[in-house]
A protein has these predicted regions:
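N-terminal pre-domain/capping segments
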Residues: 1-91, 269-278
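Hydrophobic faces of well-ordered beta-strands that scaffold small-molecule active sites
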Residues: 4-9, 33-35, 58-63, 93-95, ...
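Acidic-and-aromatic substrate-binding clefts and catalytic sites of carbohydrate-active enzymes
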Residues: 10-17, 32-47, 65-76, 101-104, ...
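Conserved, mostly hydrophobic/aromatic
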Residues: 25, 33, 51, 85, ...
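Active-site acidic/histidine proton-transfer and metal-coordination neighborhood
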Residues: 39, 71-169, 261-262
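Alpha-helix-loop-beta-strand connector modules within alpha/beta enzyme cores
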Residues: 50-64, 124-127, 131, 158-164, ...
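Acidic/histidine-rich catalytic cores of soluble enzymes
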Residues: 133-230
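A short, acidic, amphipathic alpha-helical segment used as a generic capping/interface helix at domain edges
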Residues: 228-241
Length: 278
């Protein structure tokens, strides 16, 4: 059985030397980071070499959040994303922030409209076409709203899987799938051919995170270290192995009681103990 490799996303320590942080994360047992080094000080080639010498890989890069149609029409931005992807030897980049998750930046229940979703989908298709000409794919990072919001009885997630160019892959966040009221293991089986990467996230409450508003820190709760919440983490890791995924990317939007390094250590050990992560 081929095991998953552990990676992380976020867990930034802005007041610390990033290289010392990366070295410590590698020492825990992590092999990669979802995010790139593009904006770091220093020479990009040397930075990447240093990162790789720590035994770490750049797993993914973000392309755009927001208006897809505007992004698709900006040839300079498209070229920059392609350059970045090629530099890190990535076959896909990530997008997020369509209208259905508007509640995170406004108020609970503000999930856009059907027409706004169709606008988003049109833009996504345009981006996929332009990136595809250069051999770069597009991944979409989900939250819970794609599963709770429906139009004419069809969930937003099903619209994304059927109305968007089938080259679209999911950067599937299993925790948010669960918050959306869907069994993440069952959904992974359903969408197994459309999953590009896995974000492994745990929650101790299913309802509270739905009311998150970015501008209100008191609402950023419900997240917890892997294995201490209610998401079937072991089942998700097992299914990840079964469907041929390479990475288990740990994400926790807000710390609960642990420091970032304590959390990453505990999460890694929980995944390794499952037997599905090396």
């Amino acid at each position: 059985m081929s095991k998953l490799k552990a990676a992380w996303v976020g867990f930034r320590q802005p007041d610390a030397d990033p290289w010392k942080v990366y070295e410590r994360y590698a020492a825990i047992g992590y092999h990669g980071m979802d995010g790139d080094l593009w904006e770091m000080e220093g020479d990009r080639v040397e930075n990447l070499k240093h990162f790789n010498d720590l035994g770490l890989e750049v797993v993914s890069s973000w392309a755009v959040r927001g208006d897809m149609k505007e992004f698709a029409a900006d040839d300079q931005k498209i070229a920059e994303v392609i350059e970045r992807a090629h530099f890190y030897n990535l076959d896909a980049v990530t997008m997020g922030g369509i209208s259905v998750i508007s509640s995170f930046n406004s108020y609970y229940g503000n999930n856009g409209t059907y027409d706004e979703l169709m606008y988003d989908i049109e833009g996504m298709n345009a981006v996929i076409e332009k990136l595809g000409r250069e051999g770069i794919g597009l991944m979409y990072h989900n939250h819970y709203q794609e599963f709770t919001v429906s139009y004419d009885g069809v969930s937003v997630m099903d619209y994304l899987l059927t109305d968007v160019d089938r080259r679209l892959k999911l950067k599937l966040d299993v925790g948010w799938v669960w918050v959306g009221g869907v069994d993440p293991v069952a959904f992974m089986e359903k969408a197994k051919d459309r999953i590009g990467l896995l974000h492994i996230k745990d929650f101790y409450d299913q309802e509270i995170p739905r009311h998150l508003v970015n501008q209100k820190p008191e609402t950023r709760i419900g997240f917890t270290m892997l294995g201490t919440g209610k998401v079937d983490i072991q089942g998700c890791l097992k299914k990840g192995v079964e469907i041929g995924q390479k990475w288990a990317i740990v994400e926790q939007d807000t710390m609960r009681n642990l420091t970032m390094e304590e959390d990453l250590t505990g999460s890694f050990l929980a995944m390794k103990e499952s037997g599905y992560v090396e």
